[in-house]
Structure formats: structure tokens, C-alpha cells
């Protein structure tokens, strides 16, 4: 992942995180502060998780698979993209931590 990829994909993380914060702003619930902290982390780590999911998916499939069949440009694809964006946002914190730990372990094992 490079800086250009991060900045091109960070907007969806900010939009999704902003929506989550906006929807929970007026509600009082027990873990509100924790929810806000996780949402803020998700906003920042969204591009890392998206890259990790795409990289993992492309290890098992070819790029042309994602442009044909079920994933062709149809109205149903928009719903699938919304579910994908939500899933990446929810998984951004755990996947980013897994990615960061794997990079650290690889670098330490090379030495």
C-alpha cells in the first residue's frame, strides 16, 4: 500500500465513520465513548483494511473474476458494494492490527 492508495480510499472511511458518529450523537448508551473511539480508529484505518481484504482476495482469485458474473455492473452490485464498505469499516481495526503485526514479525524474522 502506498500514500496515493491511502488518500484515494480514506474518504469512504471518513464518510462511514462520520455517519456512525452522527447517528449515535444524541443517544445515551453505556459504551458510547468506546463506540466513538472505535469509530474514529475505523475512520483512520479503513484504507489499510480495504487494501488487506483486496490483497487477500486477489491471492485466491483472478482480477477478471471481480468484473464478471455476479459482480457485473448491475443495480444489485450497488447493494453488494454497500455491504462491502460496511464490512471493511467494521473489520478495519482487527484487520489493520493483524497486518501491522505480520509486517513487524516479517521484518524481525529477516534479521
UniProtKB/Swiss-Prot annotation:
Keywords: Bacteriocin immunity, Cell membrane, Membrane, Plasmid, Transmembrane, Transmembrane helix. The chain crosses the membrane at residues 33-53, 85-105. It is found in: Cell membrane. It comes from the Bacteria. One of its GO terms (molecular function) is toxic substance binding. GO terms for cellular component: plasma membrane. Disulfide bonds: none annotated. It is a multi-pass membrane protein. One of its GO terms (biological process) is bacteriocin immunity. Pfam families: Microcin. InterPro entries: Microcin (IPR003061). This protein is able to protect a cell, which harbors the plasmid ColIa-CA53 encoding colicin Ia, against colicin Ia. This is Colicin-Ia immunity protein. It comes from Escherichia coli. The lineage of its organism: Bacteria, Pseudomonadati, Pseudomonadota, Gammaproteobacteria, Enterobacterales.
Amino acid at each position: 500500500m502506498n500514500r496515493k492508495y491511502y488518500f484515494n480510499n480514506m474518504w469512504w472511511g471518513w464518510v462511514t465513520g462520520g455517519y456512525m458518529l452522527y447517528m449515535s450523537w444524541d443517544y445515551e448508551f453505556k459504551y458510547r465513548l468506546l463506540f466513538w473511539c472505535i469509530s474514529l480508529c475505523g475512520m483512520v484505518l479503513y484504507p489499510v483494511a480495504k487494501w488487506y481484504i483486496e490483497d487477500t482476495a486477489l491471492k485466491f482469485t483472478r482480477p477478471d473474476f471481480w468484473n464478471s458474473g455476479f459482480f457485473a455492473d448491475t443495480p444489485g452490485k450497488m447493494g453488494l458494494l454497500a455491504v462491502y464498505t460496511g464490512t471493511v469499516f467494521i473489520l478495519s481495526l482487527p484487520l489493520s492490527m493483524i497486518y501491522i503485526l505480520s509486517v513487524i514479525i516479517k521484518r524481525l524474522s529477516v534479521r
